């Protein structure tokens, strides 16, 4: 986990992408934000980049590769798994089945994507502060 690395945000809604960008700007975190509209674009980037991202934030319902499929592909890829990148879902679809499936794929968090920008900002602030304090095996490489 590279705490100064980019935050990968996979979100097919351009409106939600702008909301995430605005929130990170208001919170004054210096991490680069890399937006992808679907899981296949993000997976291609993660498989080819030399940069180690700080965190992956993903929606679930997206075209091509949905969030669950993306998480599964990352989790099964030994090289990507060793990067120790926290994988978090932010989704409006927080039903019991989706939450259970997410945690069966070893995600590090599942958050309801609030339609209230202040609520979403509060959640993102807490998430960022938590992960900035965490120690991961990759900290020792």
Where are these regions (language model features)?
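Receiver (REC) domain active-site loop signature in two-component systems and cognate sites
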Residues: 62
């Amino acid at each position: 986990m590279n705490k100064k690395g980019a935050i990968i945000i996979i979100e097919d809604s351009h409106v939600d992408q702008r909301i995430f960008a605005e929130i990170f700007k208001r919170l004054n975190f210096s991490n680069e934000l890399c937006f992808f509209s679907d899981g296949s674009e993000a997976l291609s980037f993660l498989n080819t980049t030399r940069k180690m991202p700080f965190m992956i934030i993903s929606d679930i319902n997206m075209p091509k590769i949905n969030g669950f499929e993306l998480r599964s592909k990352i989790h099964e890829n030994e090289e990507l798994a060793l990067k120790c990148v926290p994988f978090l879902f932010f989704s409006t679809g927080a039903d019991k089945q989706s939450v259970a499936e997410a945690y069966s794929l070893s995600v590090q968090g599942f958050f309801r994507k609030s339609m209230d920008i202040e609520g979403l900002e509060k959640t993102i602030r807490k998430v960022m502060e938590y992960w900035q304090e965490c120690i991961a095996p990759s900290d020792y490489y």
